[in-house]
Amino acid sequence: MAENNRAVVKLKERFANALLDCTEYRGEVTVTVKKENILEVLKCLRDDLRYNFLTDVTAVDYLGQDPRFMVVYHLMSIPNKDRIRVKAPLTEADCSIDSATALWNSADWVEREAYDMFGIDFKNHPNLVRILMTDDWVGHPLRKDYPLQGPDREPYKGRLS
């Protein structure tokens, strides 16, 4: 059960008002926190609970729901051989969250990818620019309201091979 997990117990003690949900599925614990508290929670997990490896940051688009977006952090404690998932909901009107690059350098490119694909604004990111799409690309291709056929664009005229 998630309630018996050491990390969940510690987070409930320190961030009772910031935690929105705690679940466990197939041994994987997920905590959902208010976006305003994301850096404090991630720092506690890193410094106090030894979740020393940020494996991924991504986003999910729940078009038609409020909140529309969920930013998802996958953390691993190498010393404790444990994983935890941390989620933070974002509304469509305020699609921004603090960058985790101050805690983990590995957040750099994955936050840029979430920005590029979903339009999530990672505040205080050192270089929040597109990483996969061209600089002139309009829109964010993994949003559920992005046109399936893609935007009308001129065919590529450069060398293909």
UniProtKB/Swiss-Prot annotation:
It catalyses: a quinone + NADH + 5 H(+)(in) = a quinol + NAD(+) + 4 H(+)(out). It is a peripheral membrane protein. It is an enzyme of class 7 (translocase). Belongs to the complex I 30 kDa subunit family. Keywords: Cell inner membrane, Cell membrane, Membrane, NAD, Quinone, Translocase, Transport, Ubiquinone. One of its GO terms (cellular component) is plasma membrane. It is found in: Cell inner membrane. It comes from Citrifermentans bemidjiense (strain ATCC BAA-1014 / DSM 16622 / JCM 12645 / Bem). SUPFAM superfamilies: Nqo5-like. GO terms for molecular function: NADH dehydrogenase (ubiquinone) activity; NADH:ubiquinone reductase (non-electrogenic) activity; quinone binding. Its EC number is 7.1.1.-. Pfam families: Complex1_30kDa. This is NADH-quinone oxidoreductase subunit C. The keyword Metal-binding does not apply. NDH-1 shuttles electrons from NADH, via FMN and iron-sulfur (Fe-S) centers, to quinones in the respiratory chain. The immediate electron acceptor for the enzyme in this species is believed to be ubiquinone. Couples the redox reaction to proton translocation (for every two electrons transferred, four hydrogen ions are translocated across the cytoplasmic membrane), and thus conserves the redox energy in a proton gradient. Coiled coil: none annotated. It comes from the Bacteria. Its main location: membrane. NDH-1 is composed of 14 different subunits. Subunits NuoB, C, D, E, F, and G constitute the peripheral sector of the complex. Transmembrane segments: none annotated.
